[in-house]
Amino acid sequence: MNPNQKIITIGSVSLGLVVLNILLHIVSITITVLVLPGNGNNGSCNETVIREYNETVRIEKITQWHNTNVIEYIERPESDHFMNNTEPLCDAKGFAPFSKDNGIRIGSRGHVFVIREPFVSCSPTECRTFFITQGSLLNDKHSNGTVKDRSPYRTLMSVEIGQSPNVYQARFEAVAWSATRCHDGKKWMTIGVTGPDAKAVAVVHYGGIPTDVIQSWAGDILRTQESSCTCIQGECYWVMTDGPANRQAQYRAFKAKQGKIIGQTEISFNGGHIEECSCYPNEGKVECVCRDNWTGTNRPVLVISPDLSYRVGYLCAGLPSDTPRGEDSQFTGSCTSPMGNQGYGVKGFGFRQGIDVWMGRTISRTSRSGFEILRVRNGWVQNSKEQIKRQVVVDNLNWSGYSGSFTLPVELTKRNCLVPCFWVEMIRGKPEEKTIWTSSSSIVMCGVDHEIADWSWHDGAILPFDIDKM
């Protein structure tokens, strides 16, 4: 075969293969378009399916066309009913770890906000960690001076529980240097306090939209809980303080529905001091354990009914739970009066368990270090010193800080009671450490039917950071 014949033969074979390939494609398209729709199985075309991922429902609209899936993520629909939250608290034998964000450790090399006052609150479908940023990042020059409580740069933001407060996953909630937030079953409600000390304003947000305001009525640093507010059958409750931190101030309880204030009441508490209440629902009422920043080392207790009537006093237990405080052996306790004669204080919490009480406190009597939770027999109603359970969460070699309460709703747990949970803030930096900044991370614990061993889930960041050495 001469060269020309070889070229013709190769060309003919190649042309034949091309024609065969085209014919196969035509047959494939014909079968796909004409034959497959006739088999009566159209279920996969333009189909909306619901899939579950880690307790979060994600709705996907899947459109199939020539073996190609086009997936469109659809916003989660709002619930059409309010949460009840009239169930009793579950009885807890111990508290198991729920989450830990490790924000400061991650922030040494990651884009993590400088924060304080973290807290947790839950909707029917998720729990989120909320925190008040300083408008700056860890290990950055703008973190200098963030020991200051109030500034125009502070904002309330949130992440899914367990995530660090990082810039990539955080969601803006409100401009605020004091805040509270809770979910009524349909939407989130937020109260964010901001502005000058003498004329601060609390802005109520519902579903992300400003819906109402509260003006400072005493002109002395209007402030709120720094933890979850409480919603019962669609009505949400929270407590605010206006006035001095070291003597008699003014206190009010508020009630809102779908972001509009529908009631408020002045809390008469002469000789007592209420700040930074940690509240939770229990048997149709709101129970709060607060901070006395004036004299008491026992904690104020406020129980609010749906009609805004209330009972106010002090945690009866014969053990103090504020910091600083004196020796347990020298403390007698009182259900009605401040005891201990120690100024200052720290945000804390307690849970009623029948007539017992779980009460959290720092291990140190003089500084915000270590953290333990004690169950005191009859401590809700009597000056009892009888500890029937004790659990260490942060050892006394490590810093702690604020602590507060929240509950897991029955929509999340499928139980017939509300699971009691708490968080512990672990403050790092100024004023205790040689840094230019102050920030915190947190550990979150929830009640379980088992005793849990003592351990220390402390912050663990190695300080100082690079910015502190410049």
Curated annotation (Swiss-Prot):
The cofactor required is: Ca(2+)
Q: Where is this region: Head of neuraminidase?
A: 89-470
Q: Which residues bind Ca(2+)?
A: D292, G296, D322
- What EC identifiers does the entry list? 3.2.1.18
Transmembrane regions: 15-35
Query: Where are the residues of the annotated region Involved in apical transport and lipid raft association?
Result: 11-32
Q: What does this protein do?
A: Catalyzes the removal of terminal sialic acid residues from viral and cellular glycoconjugates. Cleaves off the terminal sialic acids on the glycosylated HA during virus budding to facilitate virus release. Additionally helps virus spread through the circulation by further removing sialic acids from the cell surface. These cleavages prevent self-aggregation and ensure the efficient spread of the progeny virus from cell to cell. Otherwise, infection would be limited to one round of replication.
The protein's name? Neuraminidase
Q: Gene encoding this chain? A: NA
